Amino acid sequence: MSYSIGIDYGTASGRVFLINTTNGQVVSKFVKPYTHGVIESELNGLKIPHTYALQNSNDYLEIMEEGISYIVRESKIDPDNIVGIGIDFTSSTIIFTDENLNPVHNLKQFKNNPHAYVKLWKHHGAYKEAEKLYQTAIENNNKWLGHYGYNVSSEWMIPKIMEVMNRAPEIMEKTAYIMEAGDWIVNKLTNKNVRSNCGLGFKAFWEEETGFHYDLFDKIDPKLSKVIQDKVSAPVVNIGEAVGKLDDKMAQKLGLSKETMVSPFIIDAHASLLGIGSEKDKEMTMVMGTSTCHLMLNEKQHQVPGISGSVKGAIIPELFAYEAGQSAVGDLFEYVAKQAPKSYVDEAENRNMTVFELMNEKIKHQMPGESGLIALDWHNGNRSVLSDSNLTGCIFGLTLQTKHEDIYRAYLEATAFGTKMIMQQYQDWHMEVEKVFACGGIPKKNAVMMDIYANVLNKKLIVMDSEYAPAIGAAILGAVSGGAHNSINDAVDAMKEPILYEINPEAEKVQRYETLFKAYKALHDIHGYKKANIMKDIQSLRVEG
């Protein structure tokens, strides 16, 4: 009997799972919020700009060390039977280190410098740099930009590197290596300096055939090319391969065998496809958490406007993986719950239920359009298909009779409409969608929301019985790297999560949502394309820290 470890680094917390490689059984699990959380408003008592989202990398090591110690102790499994470790991580979450892989934010002189810290995926401080990258690529007719949806996001690695070069050159001077945080964990485990094809391909303008696009970097700033070459470039390990064995000192520290193999890191949402068993084309998977990623696989590389990228072999060898997404989903619902009137909070408490459960109860019998509201779910910008992190949310149709649960439902529907925009974009560019999977904590807990999605998308929705699909997917890669299975496909077949339930669309609701979607699309196009300056002009009045 063999086992593998899957370590899942999310936005707010980390998870360590011990999985049976034969049947996918969860033997033990450890879940812990990051000690320092997400650093968004202030750093060590100092105010930082509202576009920033940072983290402390020491939290990641804490999760790994405490988590592995716990699952080995709690499961009583012989460490010699743990054959592999897989890592998934939010992305693009990047870290700056010295030559010994020590993060520069741990240096005393940079303790209060936000640019020394981990830049979380939803850090939008590099929006000016992203715009410069995009304009330069367009001016130079870089055709490969189509592999990234003809857009550049401030959430990606290269704009964030440019941000540090421009605003904190003293940090760059002390930095020996720049990498995805997922790569950093892998390198700490193995004492190597490698990069995953998944992270580089989706977030750093790297392609298997051509490598980095230095021609573009040179036109922006020759110094940028040198930074990429000296600090980012490293041997690349593909998903499905092994990086190597645990470093001896790390094995001793973690209480594991030094024969334990480590796989390259995979982006967290991408790991979910493996965890739920989506291995084919014509299947769209929604990985739903603080944000939502919409993932597909295809044998060909199509240039789909507005998506976040397409990379060969980033999930399944020989297939192109496609990613699109929405920047605020779970975060948006949490925002609405926090705005609930005191009477709702008190009622929920008296009835021993959450505010979410109370609001779901209040809206579950409403028909589409009953509230008269429609919203744009851009509270954290729009990732797909507009690729504009500077857009903001709106709600239309408010009256003096509007109730809080009506607003909540409007936001649920808005995220479903945003998903439909993405699904239609895939289909318009020769990628048919026959099945839609939903995984994550939100789908499992919120059947009302899933009913809305099934009817908005007019597709059968398959909800998976897993809040932790990324951790399962990471463990699958760990099992492959450790030799428990001969291929990713074999490991997926043995270890994937089961289906929880399926929802079929209802004709009357579908028809009503078609009418609402036309209104949503009109507002989307007005405020996203034609009059996008309205939101941005308002935001420009905010005082930057």
From Swiss-Prot:
Keyword check for Signal: no
Similarity annotation: Belongs to the ribulokinase family.
Protein name as it appears in the record: Ribulokinase
EC number(s) stated in the UniProt entry for this protein: 2.7.1.16
NCBIfam families: PRK04123.1
One BP term from GO: L-arabinose catabolic process to xylulose 5-phosphate
Disulfide bonds, paired cysteine numbers: none
Species: Staphylococcus aureus (strain NCTC 8325 / PS 47)
Catalysed reaction, written as an equation: D-ribulose + ATP = D-ribulose 5-phosphate + ADP + H(+); L-ribulose + ATP = L-ribulose 5-phosphate + ADP + H(+)
Swiss-Prot/TrEMBL keywords: Arabinose catabolism, ATP-binding, Carbohydrate metabolism, Kinase, Nucleotide-binding, Transferase
Signal peptide bounds: none
A molecular function (GO) term: ATP binding
Source lineage: Bacteria, Bacillati, Bacillota, Bacilli, Bacillales
Pathway(s) the chain acts in: Carbohydrate degradation; L-arabinose degradation via L-ribulose; D-xylulose 5-phosphate from L-arabinose (bacterial route): step 2/3
Record carries keyword Membrane: no
Alphabetical list of HAMAP family matching this protein: Ribulokinase
A cellular component annotation (GO) from this entry: cytoplasm
InterPro entries recorded: ATPase_NBD, Carb_kinase_FGGY, FGGY_C, FGGY_N, Ribulokinase
